[in-house]
Amino acid sequence: MELCTQTVPADHEVEITRRVGSHHPTVWGDHFLAYANLSGASEEEEKQHEDLKEEVRKMLVMAPSNALEKLELINTIQCLGVAYHFEHEIESYMCTHYEEYWIGDLHAIALCFRLLRQQGYRVSCDAYKKFTDDQGNFKIELINDVHGMLSLYEAAQFRVHGEEILDEALNFTTTQLKLILPKLSNSPLAQQVANALKFPIKDGIVRVEARKYISFYQQNQNHNQLLLNFAKLDFNILQMLHKKELCDITRWWKELEIVKTLPYVRDRLAEVYFWSLGVYFEPQYSTARKILTKNISMISLIDDTYDIYGTLDELTLFTEAIERWNIDASEQLQLPSYMKIIYCGLLDVYDEIKKDLANENKSFLINYSIIEMKKMVMAYFQEAKWYYGKTIPKMEEYMKNGISTSAYVQIATTSWLGMGNVATKDSFDWIVNEPPILVASSIIARLLNDLLSHEEEQKRGDAPSGVECYMKEYGVTKEEAHIKIRNTIENSWKDLYEEYFKVNGTIIPRVLLMCIINLARVIEFIYKDEDAYTFPKNNLKDVIYRILIDPII
């Protein structure tokens, strides 16, 4: 365990030995403050963008309605990250061709199947039976159709429980594509296959995948130049907006002087903004993005305080202060100075959010977020008590608490604030009851975090993760626990899409459900190979550079 001895500020004149993390400083410094005077797109760029958009719309509307060409165009538009301009046209087509997905070859069927499931339609997977032999195995000659194999691989990712044929399809295509990949040399197709094997569309963050796909598409000799030009221009215009947003949020962060006063916390504002961008990137959700970024930033401070810095007595006081949710509580409970900074900063953020929502006559909705914040902090406190009491709970107890410590119930609820009229009181009443789709997303978040960060956390001293809980309860090795937890994560993805198909088209609009799904996608990305939030300088830094700094030429 890594320890440091620090003297707490004047109100608690005692020496306390505290744990500290091994995280590095921010890799960005004041970089994003440089965009304060960024003006956005020029009038000429705006006009060009609008003209190109209408040309793409014509292409989409005029494409043959019953042809593979239409599906290919929809897929390309989605992969290029510009589908948000044509949601109505895409939905209108997909919902009227719901029963036609089984027509065509492997590529056509798999492509249509995936596009329908992405839209929230649970179409049957029986159409794939014609590609299997008498034993139920996929026919080996399919390996000669690389495009079809890739399409089947992507489609099978959207499987739910009981769809054994899709489980088999995923195993088959994963194995065969890995064998085929070296034979494709360094072609654009090889790059797409390699990317899909690591980052399937199911897990994709729109802005990250769009940046990559624009490059793939440009190398395709059959690319449509008009569509490519539109995708590039749209990416760059959005990037300018995102730069300006992050500049404004960075100014807020600097004014809090967090790094100076709370040196133990992870200074990860750009990474948090990237997280929010993964939930929604569209210009109409600018207010929601700013709200969510500030909210997650405060959660990160609180998380670090409960995980490594606060004593049990201090955390008891802070938990009570959160429960009271009153600025006077910091003085009444005599919070330590460093905790007052966090507490007052949190309440200030919520006051600011309330003012933003008042413009839409929706300030009352903030109470839903506050309720979830209180639940989350109480769950953090439970973990602290386990740590100080040297207790390793049973897996069931750990996971019940872990739904809240994942922070995703709180984050998902807060992500809907600032989204406008689409998020109604009925929607918030639904989400605070922790529907299965949200529980599934939270389990994915909790367990992925545990898998990739538990060793580092145990070195410094932390509450037991799901890995330690499972190892102790079932008497297994770390490797065996990892396998079991990976299996639980896979099953949770199935749960998530099962519920998406059930709820889509009910009182909850698809755009709200996508926030929950996108949160799961972000956590998959952040914890793909490492804890990239804590250690962004290894890989995440380069991704953020491409998404938030470097325009496409």
UniProtKB/Swiss-Prot annotation:
Pathway: Secondary metabolite biosynthesis; terpenoid biosynthesis. Its cofactor is Mg(2+); Mn(2+). Keywords: Magnesium, Metal-binding. Mg(2+) 2 binds at residues 303, 307. CDD domains: Terpene_cyclase_plant_C1. Binds 3 Mg(2+) or Mn(2+) ions per subunit. SUPFAM superfamilies: Terpenoid cyclases/Protein prenyltransferases (SSF48239), Terpenoid synthases (SSF48576). A motif (DDXXD motif) lies at residues 303-307. GO terms for biological process: diterpenoid biosynthetic process. Mg(2+) 1 binds at residues 303, 307. Expressed in leaves, trichomes and flowers. Pfam families: Terpene_synth, Terpene_synth_C. Mg(2+) 3 binds at residue 457. One of its GO terms (molecular function) is magnesium ion binding. Sesquiterpene synthase involved in the biosynthesis of volatile compounds. No activity detected with geranyl diphosphate (GPP) and farnesyl diphosphate (FPP) as substrates. Belongs to the terpene synthase family. Tpsa subfamily. The Asp-Asp-Xaa-Xaa-Asp/Glu (DDXXD/E) motif is important for the catalytic activity, presumably through binding to Mg(2+). This is Terpene synthase 16. It comes from Solanum lycopersicum. The lineage of its organism: Eukaryota, Viridiplantae, Streptophyta, Embryophyta, Tracheophyta. The gene is TPS16.
